[in-house]
UniProtKB/Swiss-Prot annotation:
Family listed: Belongs to the NhaB Na(+)/H(+) (TC 2.A.34) antiporter family.
Natural source organism: Tolumonas auensis (strain DSM 9187 / NBRC 110442 / TA 4)
A GO cellular-component term linked to this record: plasma membrane
NCBIfam families in UniProt: NhaB, PRK09547.1
Gene encoding the protein: nhaB
Transmembrane segments: 28-48, 51-71, 89-109, 137-157, 237-257, 302-322, 347-367, 390-410, 445-465, 476-496
Membrane topology: Multi-pass membrane protein
Protein role: Na(+)/H(+) antiporter that extrudes sodium in exchange for external protons.
GO function terms (MF aspect): sodium:proton antiporter activity
Protein name per Swiss-Prot or TrEMBL: Na(+)/H(+) antiporter NhaB
Keyword Transit peptide among UniProt keywords: no
Cellular location(s): Cell inner membrane
InterPro entries in alphabetical order: Na+/H+_antiporter_NhaB (IPR004671)
Keyword annotations: Antiport, Cell inner membrane, Cell membrane, Ion transport, Membrane, Sodium, Sodium transport, Transmembrane, Transmembrane helix, Transport
Catalytic reaction equation(s): 2 Na(+)(in) + 3 H(+)(out) = 2 Na(+)(out) + 3 H(+)(in)
Amino acid sequence: MVASMASALARNFLGSTPRWYKMTIVMFLIINPFIVALNPFVAGWLLVAEFIFTLSMALKCYPLLPGGLLALEAVFSGLTSAEQVKHELSANLEVLLLLMFMVAGIYFVRQLLLYVFTKLLISVRSKIALSLAFSVMAAFLSAFLDALTVVAVVISISVGFYSVYHKYVSTHPEHDINNDDSIHKQHHADLEQFRAFLRSLLMHAAVGTALGGVCTLVGEPQNLIIGEMAGWNFSEFFIRMSAVSIPVLICGLATCVLMEKLKWFGYGTVIPESVYLILKQSADHDDAHRTTQERLKLVCQAIICVWLIVGLAFHLAAVGLIGLSVIILATTFTGVSDEHAIGRAFTESLPFTALLSVFFVVVAVIIDQELFRPLIQMVLSAPQEMQLTLFYIANGVLSMVSDNVFVGTVYINEAHTALVNNVISRDHFDLLAVAINTGTNLPSVATPNGQAAFLFLLTSTLAPLVRMSYGRMMWMALPYTIVLAGVGLLSTMYLLPDMTQWFYESGWLQHKAAIPVITPASH
C-alpha cells in the first residue's frame, strides 16, 4: 500500500515530465537548504542557475512548476522574505497588468493583424525582404509600444498562419493543432520547413523589439526609469542614445539580411510553395466570402488599434489599463459577449504572468543577498575613463540572467548616488546613463531570461508548435548577440563621448549643471 502510494505520488509529481528531470528538481530541493546554511550568497547564485535551468527545459515542463517550487523554498529558507517579494510585485505592477490585459487585448484584434500580415506574407515573396520587413516593423513598433505587446502581436499572427496550414493538411474532422498524428506523411517535410520559416521570422521580430526598444524613452520600462532619473525628455533621450542606438540598429538590420543570405544559425529557410499556396487560397477565400458584418469588425479593430498606438505613444494611461480598454472596446464592437469566449483570451497570458511573478522572487533573492554588489563595487571603483566600458559590460552580463528593469534601476541609482556625493560630474553621469541603458538593453538578447519578450515567446503556446526550445533560441540569437553587444560596446567606447560633445557644440543638447531632482527609485 505504501509502495503504491509512493509510486502514485512520483507519477503525479510534475505530471508527465521525464523521470530524470523530476529527480533533478528533487535533488535541487534537497541540496539548497544545506547550501543556505553554509553560505547564503552561494545559495543565491545557485538558485539563479537552477531557475535558468528550468527555463531551458521549458519544453519538458512549464517552468512555473519547478521554478515555483524553488522560489517557495527560497522564501521558506530565508534567502528572501514574503514582504520583499510583495515589494517586487508592487514595483512591477505595470508589467503584470500589461501581461494580463494587453496580451488579452491583442487576442481580440487578431483578425485584423492576421489580415494585414497575411497580405504582407503573400505579397512579399523574397524571404530577405520579408525578414527585414518583420524586423523593421518590430523595431518601429517597440520604439513606442512595449516589446511584450509587439511579440504578442507576432505570436498571434504566427499561430494564425500555422493553424490555417495545419488544419488544411489534417485528416481528422476534429482538428488538434498540437497533434501531428493526423497529418499525412507527404506533408511532414513541408510542415518542418514551415516551422523553420516561422522560427526565423519570430527571431527577427523578437530581436527587432530590442533594436527599437533601446532608442526611445518609452521603448522599455527601464528606459523610463533611467530617463526620469537623468531628467531627460523624449527628444533628449533619443538624441543621447543615438550615438549608440543608430549604429546598432543599422548593424542589426544588416545582420538580418546577412543571416538570411548565408543561411546560418537556423535562418534562410523559405516558405514551402505548397504552404504558400494554401495560405494564399485561404486568404482569397476569406476575401471573397467576407460579409459586411465581418468587414465592419475589421474596421472597428483598425480604429481600436489606432487608439492603442495613440494611447501608448502619449502615455495616456498605464499600458495594462490601455490593454483593458482594448478588451472592452473590441469585445463590445465585434460582438463577443460570451464569458467563455472572453476567457479564452487570457489562456496565453496568465500562466506567463504567474511565471514572471515567480521570477520576481528570484529578483528578490538577488536584492536581499546582494548578489550583484561585488560587481557594482568593482565598476564604481574603476578610473572614470574606464567606467563607461565597465558599466556597459557589467550591465550586459547581469541583464542576461536577471530582470532588465532591476539591473538598470540598480546601476542608475548607484550612478545617481555618485553624482549626489560629487564623485562624478553631471556630464559624466549623463554618459554613464547612456552606457547603463544600452548595456541593459542590447546584450540581454543572448538568453530568453534576459529579455521578457523572449521569455514570453519561449513559454507561449506557439513555441512547442514551431519547436522553439531554449537552446535553439540562444543559438539563433547568437549572431545578433555578438553584433548588438559588440557594436554597442565599440560605440560606447569610441562614438559616445565624441558624438555627445558634438551634440553640445551643435546646440542639440545643453549641459545640465544641476543634479536631477528625481528621487532614486527603490527596487
